């Protein structure tokens, strides 16, 4: 139960609070953010959430874009996002010390611009994790001291586009066996280990069974705090053997003018650590527009807390979580598959090396390589095989209602 002051307490603290850490969701300044920077109004964007942020010993943000000019975008399915290098001012104005770069957009303008993004952020005093000059560097945790604690932060994303390879810059891919071993090793020497992941299904208010299993595995491997992001909407929270898991806090600042629903709503989770680990989360719900991020107040704030509890309730019920994902897949799986297949040109098999053919097949490539896309198509095809699509879809109206709550 989330208290009216936003405190989600898992247990009583032992020896008082030793360390506070907040992680913000997706930030992509887009053109509106660039305008704020150009007009010298960066601090104003965060003014109303600054007191909450400033109480933390460590502030981390999910940075969802390269910092570059829009030249030479890579071939990919999906949009190539960018923000001008000057937009790093927003991260600095928010007081963020760390930027998470393992996501599906960091590499949108190629390896050189990814490395430039790291450099631009570093020059603003913002350390980065989740991307690097090659796979080994991208996978490395960021180790730092904050609040008198030695912290190791890991950051991994799904296999979309722009992931690092042995000899190529990119973001750190989710390679669970390698990643979990690294977290377990770090847990033996660091005071706190944070596993920050990027993956899942956009606009789905619930994580998939695979995402939930993966996040729980990081908790079991020794992570003190597990954070996931990507859905562009709030998802729930659970407490796994002493480790909180935030499945998605929603966007923090992503001012696309044509997005409705829950796109502009989210929450800041602040983890409160005692000597044993995290004993509570402080949750600050907010809404944003192009100009400012504003905490929710009054009945809207309370309604958000009850909504987050609704999203969290089924997380300990595997059968229910399977039903929810089957419902989602029953409505969206066919679209993923149909769009990808529709772009494949006739006779492609005679010219597989043709660049036009390669570009046309990028969507299909993403279905096979991106874990979340693979999940949804595989689930849809299994439902089709078992003649259960209509049965699974009966639960979808409930999910649609959650996508458009009355308070939003």
Feature annotation, model-predicted:
Residues 1-81:
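N-terminal active-site segment of His-dependent metallophosphoesterases
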Residues 15, 268-408:
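A short C-terminal boundary segment appended to hydrolase-like catalytic domains
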Residues 23-25, 59-64, 94-104, 127-132, ...:
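Active-site neighborhood of phospho(di)ester-bond hydrolases with catalytic His/Asp-centered motifs
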Residues 30-32, 67-70, 104-118, 135-140, ...:
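Active-site environment of divalent metal-dependent phosphoester hydrolases
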Residues 32-47, 81-82, 143-193, 213, ...:
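Binuclear metal-dependent hydrolase catalytic cores centered on His/Asp/Glu-rich metal-binding motifs
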Residues 56-68, 103-104, 184-206:
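Short acidic, glycine-rich surface-loop motifs adjacent to enzyme active sites
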Residues 70-92, 192-224:
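Active-site-proximal segments of metal-dependent phosphoesterases and phosphodiesterases across multiple
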Residues 96-98, 209-269:
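Conserved beta-sheet core of the metallophosphoesterase superfamily
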């Amino acid at each position: 139960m989330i208290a009216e002051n936003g405190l989600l307490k898992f247990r009583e603290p032992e020896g008082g609070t030793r360390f506070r850490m907040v992680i913000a969701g997706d930030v992509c300044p887009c053109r509106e953010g660039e305008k704020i920077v150009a007009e010298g109004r960066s601090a104003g964007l965060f003014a109303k959430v600054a007191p909450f942020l400033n109480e933390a010993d460590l502030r981390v943000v999910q940075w969802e874009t390269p910092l570059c000019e829009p030249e030479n975008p890579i071939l990919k399915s999906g949009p190539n996002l960018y923000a001008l290098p000057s937009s790093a001012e927003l991260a600095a104005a928010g007081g963020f010390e760390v930027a998470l770069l393992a996501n599906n957009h960091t590499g949108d303008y190629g390896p050189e611009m990814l490395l430039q993004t790291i450099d631009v952020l570093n020059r603003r005093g913002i350390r980065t994790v989740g991307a690097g000059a090659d796979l080994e560097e991208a996978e490395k945790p960021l180790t730092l001291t904050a609040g008198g604690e030695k912290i190791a932060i890991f950051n991994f994303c799904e296999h979309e586009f722009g992931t690092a390879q042995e000899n190529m810059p990119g973001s750190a891919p989710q390679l669970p066996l390698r990643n979990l071993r690294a977290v377990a090793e770090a847990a033996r020497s660091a005071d706190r280990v944070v596993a920050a992941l990027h993956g899942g299904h956009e606009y789905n208010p619930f994580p998939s069974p695979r995402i939930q299993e993966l996040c729980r595995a990081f908790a079991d491997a020794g992570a003190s705090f597990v954070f996931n992001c990507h859905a562009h909407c709030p998802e729930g929270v659970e407490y796994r053997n002493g480790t909180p898991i935030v499945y998605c806090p929603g966007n923090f600042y992503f001012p696309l003018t044509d997005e409705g629903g829950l796109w502009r709503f989210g929450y800041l989770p602040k983890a409160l650590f005692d000597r044993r680990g995290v004993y509570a989360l402080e949750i600050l719900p907010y809404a944003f527009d192009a100009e400012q991020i504003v905490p929710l107040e009054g009945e809207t704030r309370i309604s958000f807390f009850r909504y987050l509890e609704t999203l969290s309730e089924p997380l300990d019920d595997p059968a229910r979580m399977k039903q929810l994902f089957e419902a989602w897949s029953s409505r969206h799986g066919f679209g993923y598959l149909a769009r990808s297949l529709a772009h494949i040109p006739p006779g492609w098999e005679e010219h597989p090396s043709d660049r036009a053919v390669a570009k046309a097949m990028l969507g299909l490539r993403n279905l096979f390589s991106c874990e979340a896309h693979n999940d949804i198509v595989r689930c849809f095809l299994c439902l089709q095989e078992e003649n259960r699509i209509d049965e699974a879809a009966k639960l979808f109206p409930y999910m649609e209602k959650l996508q458009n709550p009355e308070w939003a």
